[in-house]
Curated annotation (Swiss-Prot):
GO MF term list: symporter activity; transmembrane transporter activity
Protein name: Uncharacterized symporter YhjB
TM spans (from-to): 1-21, 40-60, 74-94, 117-137, 158-178, 188-208, 234-254, 271-291, 318-338, 362-382, 388-408, 422-442, 456-476
InterPro entries associated with the record: Na/Glc_symporter_sf, Na/solute_symporter, Sodium:Solute_Symporter
Protein family membership: Belongs to the sodium:solute symporter (SSF) (TC 2.A.21) family.
Lipid bilayer topology: Multi-pass membrane protein
One CC-aspect GO term: plasma membrane
PANTHER family linked: MONOCARBOXYLIC ACID PERMEASE, SODIUM/PROLINE SYMPORTER-RELATED
GO biological process entries: transmembrane transport
Subcellular compartments: Cell membrane
Amino acid sequence: MNAALIIIFGVLLLSIFLGIRAQKGKDMNLEQWTVGGRGFGTVFVFLLMAGEIYTTFTFLGGSGWAYGKGGPAFYIIAYGCLAYILSYWLLPAVWTYAKQHKLMSQSDFFTKKYNSPLLGILVSLVGIAALIPYLVLQLKGLGLIVSETSYGKITPTAAIWIGAVSITVYVMVSGIHGSAWISVVKDIMILVVVLFLGVYLPIHYYGGFQDMFQQIETAKPGFLTLPESGQSVAWFSSTVLLTALGFYMWPHTFSASYSAENPKVFRKNAIIMPLYQLVLLFVLFVGFAAILQVPDLNGADGDLSLLRLSLQAFDPWFVGIIGAAGLLTALVPGSMILMSASTLFAKNVYKVIAPRTTEQQVSALAKFLVPVIALISVYFTFKGGNTIVTLLLMGYSLVTQLFPALLFSLLKHNMVTKQGAFAGIIAGVGAVTYITMTETTIGTLFPALPQAAKDLNVGIVALLLNITVMMAVSLMTRKAKSAAADQAA
């Protein structure tokens, strides 16, 4: 057993210990298990939401896109900053309403706002459908990280199974408390590792950042800028907008906001989080540094650029630290995803269908579903071949369809009816499904459009269709309701 393997397993065991110990002295009812009794302060909410947002994508997807795509990879930094600005106003309003009505999941929010259990079921199913590829992303990344940094001693298959079992155990025992404590370890490690790699590797291989970018530009002219077509300025802007709108629409991120002790926590975090977003810049630097040093990583193999360059540059003990940090970037969000998906199904699907179910039975079912959902995700992890970023964008396309109905629900006078919200989400999700399965672009849908329009992220089409259907159905149902009221009078 080499030094890297010892460190990786040591951190894994520490994480499991912290995760299980976190429930000590607490009555783990459904509210404690899912939202921590709504007692987390600024630091814990910051670490928890950072733990969910900065995932294996931070380690592999960001550097992989810098390596394979060049300039377009900078969208990764931009959309988070825009989302944090939105959160300054969005999350306090969500938290206040959730606390007032003792809500525990994202679906609870939609159910209560629109007085529609059926809409709550739809939101749950959309959330679960988006969370599966997101969990697959974490497990796929976990397999790559542990396998590479253990020098092949642990296969990706074994790493995925070990990670899935570890997450399942501490989620079932401690819920959100386990995730919060492991976030502390994870955030310290990822900050140190990513900042070091992002500074050291460009200097080590190129002598500095300017020399690195000059050499890349010489070898691959135009690679570091946005192209005139394809992933152009139009694509960049539309993708940043879409992903920013979907940023807090993930069920696990949305419900994690309920755990804060007061709404001021979110405003403080909205100021701090953009600084934390700069961590991603150093991840991109590693991807850029790998372009000329680890050539010929094609397609999905680009996600290995950070790991392959690290193996080439460092001794096994430090590679072990990198692997351990990468391991935690999968465990923390993976645990939140598992908990959210199981709670959504138990509380917002099963309990609606079987209303006589008690809270204790819902809690037991949610915990029972944790290993079931983990097994489903492991299956898709082994079957799928998508890159890390592709999986993330697919999930974002789905959850973004929930944003219009949420936004209108926060207005003082909501013009959207429950029928309109339902129809809009169905239309948007249907469009996303068709676009994903057929690999449609705006260019293939509307070939006569100018190039800038054809380069727009095709998710714009799904979102516009969602809003159009939502408003049209709301208008019709309002008129029908008004006509019925007039007849009754």
